[in-house]
Amino acid sequence: MYYTSYRSQVFGVARIFASFNDTFVHVTDLSGKETIARVTGGMKVKADRDESSPYAAMLAAQDVAAKCKEVGITAVHIKLRATGGTKTKTPGPGGQSALRALARSGLRIGRIEDVTPVPSDSTRRKGGRRGRRL
């Protein structure tokens, strides 16, 4: 197809965005311009509270992997992202299980990279002078 191949592997880029409210599994070509498949945890489960769960992320990743194989992608580089910025830099609960599901589905894993946006110096974080009081 139109993807560069490396040692007879056809690569795509799996961008996993794992927040504490949802998990996105989005596969593009190497340039990032062409979307091949994008599935979220919320598309796979009915209850709102389960959108970010590892189970929903696993189902989303399996769907994406099936679509990739259909198109002819055999390997993916993974870019894992948390919310970042002034919010949490820790990936949500679905990140790890989405990555594992992609690996177990038969897709080869190239490079794994954390692309969470980290501010060099940012605007003030929400919560006020005395912070969030529980």
UniProtKB/Swiss-Prot annotation:
Any single Pfam family the record assigns to this protein: Ribosomal_S11
Annotated source species: Candida albicans
Similarity section: Belongs to the universal ribosomal protein uS11 family.
Coiled-coil features, chain-numbered ranges: none
Name the record gives this protein: Small ribosomal subunit protein uS11
Keywords assigned by UniProt, alphabetized: Ribonucleoprotein, Ribosomal protein
Gene3D superfamilies cross-referenced by the UniProt entry: Ribosomal protein S11
This protein's GO CC annotations: ribonucleoprotein complex; ribosome
Start and end residues of each stretch annotated as Disordered: 114-134
GO biological process: one example: translation
Biased amino acid composition, Basic residues: 125-134
Molecular functions per Gene Ontology: structural constituent of ribosome
Superkingdom in the source lineage: Eukaryota
UniProt KW Ribonucleoprotein keyword: yes
